[in-house]
């Protein structure tokens, strides 16, 4: 039998994982991406003349990658060395109010006690136990399934797991659910922020998203060379198995060709293939951007159902006044006002700001010279309406800087050379999204079941990435790529 050919359109996390699994199993794999390097959203830019991650910065669920690499005979730790963070994140509010979450659960409980009192510490202990129960119930029955299915979830969770899900009021919102554990508004704010990991509002997202707390407690890792290095490793390993990568190669059309497909690039070159894994936002297919034949292959995401976008700045500066670690969150005073603005399609007046200090780990001592920094604030996914006016972008940068200053962080070198990326730029990078970075918003308990599965309505055409099941985030996108590869292998070998 001739070697089966599979084309992967997109070299983001989902596409890279699919390419690794397929090439490791002996399939003829070609990967196409219009960018000059692998990574997709795990892209890299420069700050102070040095490379810096400009996309996802938090690496969790390392065992997913260990298992995937092991399935094709590789040792993930040898391929991508990483250090486990002892401080998961440092959180700050106005003045000197600061709180660290630790990898060690006992230390975190004691930190909550010192920060907010014994009642909140007891609530945090219950919250941690319940978030672990939710993850255990959903990991196999939902996250690792090829498509979202409510009955399958119930069956997979079993009689033992179902009470664990019901115990956290899965039909209520995350914000309301957090009220069962915390009276301190700052802690509700902190754990409510987990909804933004999937581009959603804690006031609309389901309470089951508390599972993110357990995922982080299970381990936050710092990969040597940054997150972009992870993308490079996946591409390198797939290439070693024989996969061929085509960069600066924009797939303009996917067309039927007998029982298979033809991919046509923007330069006119064509490639024949037996199956296609599309590692772009599912909305691009639904909107017919790769050919009108595929408009019904997967449901479209209406603009009002989009997840969040962001405005990010990457720059280099010396800092003082606040002891940065790798991951830092500076909370605004009014969390509800933030998400009300986003829901109305507006930039936030007083934004919560995330700062990744890529040159730091758990050591918060000042760095010699300028250090690489990424700052991020949430923004509405309105990038298809045009770029933000320069004065609005500058005003948002000023407001973000004021938030950092209110928490004590000062830049000795004003980041005038900061590279900003706003929703219209994300929309250009990831077409059909409006700049949404996480696919469909996870608002309401049904939302997770409305994401498309990895199999589309077209035989031989599959989805992989954060807009497909099981959802956004680096490990979830990896799981979708693994599932897409598994489905493609099963379907092709059964023909």
Where are each of the predicted segments found?
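Mid-domain catalytic core of redox enzymes
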Residues: 252-367
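Helical element adjacent to the flavin cofactor pocket in flavoenzyme catalytic cores
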Residues: 211-257
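A conserved FAD-binding loop/helix module that cradles the flavin
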Residues: 466-488
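Rossmann-like flavin
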Residues: 94-204
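Active-site-proximal substrate-binding core of FAD-dependent oxidoreductases
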Residues: 490-495
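A glycine-rich dinucleotide-binding beta-alpha-beta segment and adjacent secondary-structure elements
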Residues: 184-198, 350-354, 410-470
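N-terminal glycine-rich phosphate/pyrophosphate-binding loop and immediately adjacent elements
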Residues: 4-137
């Amino acid at each position: 039998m001739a070697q089966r050919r599979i084309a992967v359109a997109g070299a983001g996390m989902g596409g890279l994982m699919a390419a690794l699994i397929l090439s490791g199993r002996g399939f003829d794999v070609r990967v196409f991406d219009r960018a000059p390097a692998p990574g997709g959203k795990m892209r890299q830019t420069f700050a102070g003349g040095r490379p810096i991650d400009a996309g996802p910065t938090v690496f969790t669920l390392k065992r997913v990658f260990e298992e995937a690499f092991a399935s094709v005979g590789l040792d993930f730790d040898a391929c991508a060395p990483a250090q486990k963070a002892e401080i998961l994140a440092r959180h700050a509010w106005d003045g000197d109010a600061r709180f660290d979450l630790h990898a060690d659960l006992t230390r975190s409980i004691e930190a909550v006690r010192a920060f907010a009192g014994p009642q909140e510490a007891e609530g945090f202990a219950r919250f941690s136990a319940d978030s672990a129960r939710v993850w255990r119930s959903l990991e196999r029955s939902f996250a690792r399934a090829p498509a979202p299915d409510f009955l399958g979830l119930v069956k997979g969770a079993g009689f033992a797991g179902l009470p664990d899900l019901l115990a956290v009021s899965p039909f209520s919102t995350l914000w309301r659910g957090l009220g069962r554990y915390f009276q301190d508004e700052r802690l509700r704010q902190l754990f409510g922020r987990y909804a933004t990991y999937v581009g959603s509002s804690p006031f609309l997202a389901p309470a089951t998203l508390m599972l993110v707390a357990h995922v982080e407690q299970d381990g936050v890792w710092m990969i040597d060379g940054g997150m972009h290095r992870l993308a490079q490793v996946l591409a390198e390993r797939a290439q070693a198995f024989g996969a061929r990568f085509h960069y600066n190669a924009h797939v303009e059309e996917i067309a039927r060709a007998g029982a298979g497909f033809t991919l046509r690039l923007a330069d006119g070159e064509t490639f024949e293939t037996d199956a296609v894994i599309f590692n772009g936002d599912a909305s691009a297919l639904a909107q017919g951007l790769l050919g009108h034949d595929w408009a019904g292959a997967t449901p479209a995401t209406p603009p009002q159902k989009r997840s969040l976008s962001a405005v990010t700045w990457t720059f280099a500066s010396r800092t003082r006044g606040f002891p940065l670690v790798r991951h830092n969150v500076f909370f605004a005073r009014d969390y509800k006002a933030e998400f009300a603005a986003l829901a109305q399609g507006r930039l936030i007046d007083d934004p919560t700001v995330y700062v990744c200090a890529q040159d730091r780990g758990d050591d918060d001592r000042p760095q010699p010279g300028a250090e690489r920094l990424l700052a991020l604030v949430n923004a509405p996914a309105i990038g298809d309406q045009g770029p933000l006016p320069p004065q609005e972008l500058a005003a948002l940068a000023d407001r973000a800087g004021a938030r950092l200053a209110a928490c004590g962080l000062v830049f000795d070198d004003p980041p005038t050379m900061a590279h900003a990326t706003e929703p219209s730029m994300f929309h250009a990078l990831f077409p059909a999204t409006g700049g949404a970075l996480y696919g469909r918003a996870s608002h309401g308990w049904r939302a997770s079941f409305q994401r498309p599965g990895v199999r589309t309505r077209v035989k031989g055409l599959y989805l992989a990435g954060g807009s497909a099941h099981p959802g956004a985030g680096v490990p979830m996108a990896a799981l979708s790529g693994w599932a897409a590869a598994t489905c493609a292998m099963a379907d092709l070998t059964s023909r």
